[in-house]
């Protein structure tokens, strides 16, 4: 698979910036039952304690917690589906990005700063302050230029690699569900 060049990636910035700001669409749900395993789901349950039910987050160790337990602010990894489509080319390859939820919505720090809440189906999640930066697997699957692109100054402002979130209110999410930014008082 040919990876995109930086010029090709940057040429898509206008399209990426056109993602909906207040109401988007959940386009893909992926459960990661074990390391490097992916299950594409039509529907999933989100839980404030377990995250996405059946996902391996609950068993993953974190270097960011004192006891190495799963980080509560990283229950969910969410990526803008326009970015995923750009780097993955084919929707069959989207799950390789390693995120659980792929949504067509502006995930930028300006639009969804840490603490922002998002309703998806009957669930509510909260955006974490912890950055989602990717790993060596992202480079292997989508190329070094894609990693540089999502972690560039603009990429970080727009959260092109995605965001981390935690479940505030459990509920059911389905592919095709509206993703709605909840106004803060």
Report residues per predicted region.
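Metal-cofactor-dependent catalytic cores
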Residues: 1-185
């Amino acid at each position: 698979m040919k990876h995109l060049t930086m010029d090709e990636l940057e040429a898509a910035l206008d399209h990426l910036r056109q993602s909906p700001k207040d109401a988007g669409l959940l386009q893909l749900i992926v459960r990661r039952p074990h390391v490097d395993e992916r299950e594409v789901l039509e529907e999933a349950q989100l839980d404030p304690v377990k995250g996405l039910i059946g996902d391996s987050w609950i068993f993953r160790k974190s270097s960011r917690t004192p006891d190495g337990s799963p980080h509560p602010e990283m229950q969910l990894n969410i990526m803008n589906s326009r970015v995923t489509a750009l780097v993955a080319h084919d929707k069959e390859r989207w799950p390789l990005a390693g995120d659980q939820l792929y949504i067509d919505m502006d995930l930028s720090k300006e639009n969804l700063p840490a603490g922002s809440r998002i309703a998806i189906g009957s669930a509510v999640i909260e955006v974490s302050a912890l950055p989602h930066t990717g790993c060596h697997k992202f480079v292997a699957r989508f190329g070094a230029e894609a990693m540089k692109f999502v972690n560039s100054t603009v990429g970080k402002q727009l959260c092109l690699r995605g965001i981390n979130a935690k479940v505030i209110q459990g509920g059911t999410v389905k592919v095709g569900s509206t993703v709605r930014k909840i106004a803060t008082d």
